[in-house]
Structures are given as structure tokens and as C-alpha cells.
Amino acid sequence: MAIKEKQVQDYGENPIEVRDSDHYQNEYIEGFVEKWDELINWHARSSSEGEFFIKTLKEHGAKRVLDAATGTGFHSIRLIEAGFDVASVDGSVEMLVKAFENATRKDQILRTVHSDWRQVTRHIQERFDAVICLGNSFTHLFSEEDRRKTLAEFYSVLKHDGILILDQRNYDLILDEGFKSKHTYYYCGDNVKAEPEYVDDGLARFRYEFPDQSVYHLNMFPLRKDYVRRLLHEVGFQDITTYGDFQETYHQDDPDFYIHVAKKD
């Protein structure tokens, strides 16, 4: 029987030069995906988020939701359990496989779609009340063209008055003052270190170290909050509310994460 060769992340000779929107395909290898739930810790993340996303979706009358960054299925499964009709999209096959396994263990069946964000409308012809893109996923896009294309795709699959919920790490704080995460939201795993290894205006390279000493990386683009709000507006979203760590009132530099709720008029 052939022994399956262990995958490794490949950033070439100079990792900080890898600034490509398509490179996420090489980052979410099986070993990293298997540890992803250890990083986010479903129970702790559920406690830290509370009912924020469920409450926001219900306030806007949403019933059908497209989870554009399914990952290992955390939000898709929570929303299904809360009664929403969910389609689960991800560009990583490995993530979708893990998400389906996680859902099965909770006696749920995910409706998964493998698709790059920039081509969502090629694979999905339905329209949704809401699109969610969570887990700092949008920062995998390194070019403005890719960001605009992705937001336009999200806009297209939304019904009139539909909403996009998109989050991002507080890169303003990291770029201007350095990294000082409270580690309270999103990445809640015990004894898992998640911190930037290198940062400039075009790259935030994060290092993830697990209790077994295994180390993985992600190269992401450090998006500033006001830039994202401007892009959302220019693509067509008009009513945009930004929350800091699930609070509408926050000090500019305090949150670890921003959550944008943008309405299609």
C-alpha cells in the first residue's frame, strides 16, 4: 500500500515575497486544516461571539444565507442549528471536507460548494438574504481588482435589501502600533500562539504554533478599516455599519476585529 506523502506549506525561498490571492490553495494543507478547530476552539468561540451573527441576520429578516468562507464549518453549522437555510462555500477542498465531517458529527448535512469567491456566480445561481465572509478570510486577497471582483460577486448573489457581513482583523492597530491581541475573539484555542511574524503595508505574515510544536503560516493583506468601508460603498453597498469585537460603540484602536454589516439597496 502506498504511503501518502505528508503535505508541507511551500512559500519558496523568500516567504515574504509571496503576495498572491491564489496562494491560499497551498496554505490550507491537510495538516493545517486538521488543526484549525484546535486554533479556533468552537466552544470558546461560540461563547465569545454569543448570538451576534444570528441576531444580526434575524434583525434583517434573513432566512437564506451564503457562508462564503465556510472553513471547517463553524458558522454554517451554528446557523443551520438556528434554523437558517445555508449554502456553504469555500475555495479549499480540504476545508469543505473537514466542514462536512464536522457537520455529520452534529447530525447536520452541509450543502457545500467548492468555488473561488471571484467566480461564485458561475457555481451558484440562487439569490440569498445574506452573505457572510468571516474569519478574517477577505484578507487573503492581495489585489484591489480581486477585492472588487469578490465584493461584486457577493453583491450579485444578494437579494434586494440583502446584507453582507464581512469581518477583518484590526490591521490599523497592527500597522500603526504593533500587535497586542487580547485573544478573546475568533482564535480562542488554549496554548495556540497566533501572531504576526512579519508586517509591512502589503503583507501580514502570521505564524501559528500548536502545542505539539507544529508551526504553520498564512500570508495575508493588512486591510485598513476605512479602505474596506470605501470599497464596500464603491461596489454598491450603501448602508454600512462597522462593529468592533461585536460592539457598535468602540474606541478606534481597541478591537481585535472589525465586523462590517453592509446592506444592498
From Swiss-Prot:
Give the highest taxon in the source lineage: Bacteria
User: Does the keyword Plastid belong to this entry?
Assistant: no
SUPFAM superfamilies per the UniProt record, alphabetical: S-adenosyl-L-methionine-dependent methyltransferases
Any one Gene Ontology MF annotation carried by this entry is:
identical protein binding
GO biological process: one example: S-adenosylhomocysteine metabolic process
Enzyme kind, highest EC tier: transferase
Question: Where does this protein hold substrate?
Answer: N136, R169, Y208
Q: Which InterPro entries match?
A: Gly/Sar_N_MeTrfase, Methyltransf_25, SAM-dependent_MTases_sf
Q: Which GO terms describe its cellular component?
A: cytosol
Annotated binding of S-adenosyl-L-methionine, by residue: Y28, W36, R45, A69, D90, D116, W117, L134
The record's keywords, sorted A to Z, are: Methyltransferase, S-adenosyl-L-methionine, Transferase
Q: Which PROSITE patterns match?
A: SAM_GNMT
The pathway noted for it is:
Amine and polyamine biosynthesis; betaine biosynthesis via glycine pathway; betaine from glycine: step 1/3; Amine and polyamine biosynthesis; betaine biosynthesis via glycine pathway; betaine from glycine: step 2/3
Activity control: Inhibited by acetate, dimethylglycine and S-adenosyl-L-homocysteine.
What Gene3D superfamilies is this protein classified in?
A: Glycine N-methyltransferase, chain A, domain 1, Vaccinia Virus protein VP39
Q: What is its EC number?
A: 2.1.1.156
- Could you tell me what reaction this enzyme catalyses? glycine + 2 S-adenosyl-L-methionine = N,N-dimethylglycine + 2 S-adenosyl-L-homocysteine + 2 H(+); glycine + S-adenosyl-L-methionine = sarcosine + S-adenosyl-L-homocysteine + H(+); sarcosine + S-adenosyl-L-methionine = N,N-dimethylglycine + S-adenosyl-L-homocysteine + H(+)
The protein's role, per its UniProt record: Catalyzes the methylation of glycine and sarcosine to sarcosine and dimethylglycine, respectively, with S-adenosylmethionine (AdoMet) acting as the methyl donor.
Its assembly, as annotated, is:
Monomer.
Q: Which family does it belong to?
A: Belongs to the class I-like SAM-binding methyltransferase superfamily. Glycine N-methyltransferase family.
Cross-referenced PANTHER family, in alphabetical order? GLYCINE N-METHYLTRANSFERASE (PTHR16458:SF2)
Q: What is this protein called?
A: Glycine/sarcosine N-methyltransferase
Q: Which organism is it from?
A: Aphanothece halophytica
